[in-house]
Amino acid sequence: MVWFKRVKPFIRTTDRRDVPEGLWSKCEDCGAMLHRRQLEENLNTCNECGHHFRISPYRYFSILFDNEEFTEFDDCLRAADPLTFVDTKKYPDRVHDTIEKSGKTEACRNAFGKSAGADLVISAMDFGFIGGSMGSVVGEKISRAADKAIELNAPLIVISQSGGARMMEGAFSLMQMAKTAARLTRLGENRLPFISLMTDPTMGGISASFAMLGDLNISEPKALIGFAGPRVIRDTIKRDLPEGFQRAEFLQEHGFVDMIVHRKELKQRLAKTLAMMRVEG
């Protein structure tokens, strides 16, 4: 007869609960774990260190337009393939796959509406579409946004979030630098303000063209802004770069950025600034 039975020790666990994917996000700067609801309430900024997460054009529209009401325009434009470009896949296939995967149609979206009760036109770039690169469609959309601002007699805000020119379109992409810069001069001729908002990243042909041409150049905190990347520059000149090189704060210190604004204060600061810049009559 067995009086005792040896039982192997074990740890009793509670029933496993599946956590929905995407419920938590980790801050890239401080490592804090942020709940999705908390992140949205803070306009996709970290409440611990102030890090600004990248957001879509629609998110900027909802932040800046009154009651999240706006009208999008020129969403029908699609990229052509003038060079029949092929890298690891054909350019049209890459565009099609990106549209299917992301649900976005291009790296730029245009909208107009009311902000603080006044008419406003916004052209916002999207890093989530082929790195926010500027091809012929992006250049055309920004140009049409300037035309819409003139039509509505309203200020224009261009929100940059891009790695630069779209290499798949070659010279057609580089032409957009001159095209957008030329079109934006018409705003000045019509005495309409143009505000450039640079977010992370604003690089390459974007920083070398319209992003630095604003009547007021604004940036989000710690945004990477420059032409070539810091690693490329370091490898070229064979020297260490200053601390914070190509960050918004460094550029403001050296006179390239007029104002750094936290996303929570963006609408209020823009409203005050545009009110002062508004020309009557």
From Swiss-Prot:
InterPro entries: AcCoA_carboxyl_beta, Acetyl_CoA_COase_Trfase_b_su, ClpP/crotonase-like_dom_sf, COA_CT_N, Znf-ACC. Pfam families: Carboxyl_trans (PF01039), Zn_ribbon_ACC (PF17848). Its EC number is 2.1.3.15. GO terms for cellular component: acetyl-CoA carboxylase complex. One of its GO terms (biological process) is malonyl-CoA biosynthetic process. PROSITE patterns: COA_CT_NTER. Its main location: cytoplasm. Signal peptide: none annotated. Residues 23-281 form the CoA carboxyltransferase N-terminal domain. Keywords: ATP-binding, Cytoplasm, Fatty acid biosynthesis, Fatty acid metabolism, Lipid biosynthesis, Lipid metabolism, Metal-binding, Nucleotide-binding, Transferase, Zinc, Zinc-finger. GO terms for molecular function: acetyl-CoA carboxylase activity; ATP binding; carboxyl- or carbamoyltransferase activity; zinc ion binding. Its cofactor is Zn(2+). It is an enzyme of class 2 (transferase). It catalyses: N(6)-carboxybiotinyl-L-lysyl-[protein] + acetyl-CoA = N(6)-biotinyl-L-lysyl-[protein] + malonyl-CoA. Pathway: Lipid metabolism; malonyl-CoA biosynthesis; malonyl-CoA from acetyl-CoA: step 1/1. Coiled coil: none annotated. Acetyl-CoA carboxylase is a heterohexamer composed of biotin carboxyl carrier protein (AccB), biotin carboxylase (AccC) and two subunits each of ACCase subunit alpha (AccA) and ACCase subunit beta (AccD). Component of the acetyl coenzyme A carboxylase (ACC) complex. Biotin carboxylase (BC) catalyzes the carboxylation of biotin on its carrier protein (BCCP) and then the CO(2) group is transferred by the transcarboxylase to acetyl-CoA to form malonyl-CoA. NCBIfam families: accD. Belongs to the AccD/PCCB family. This is Acetyl-coenzyme A carboxylase carboxyl transferase subunit beta. The gene is accD.
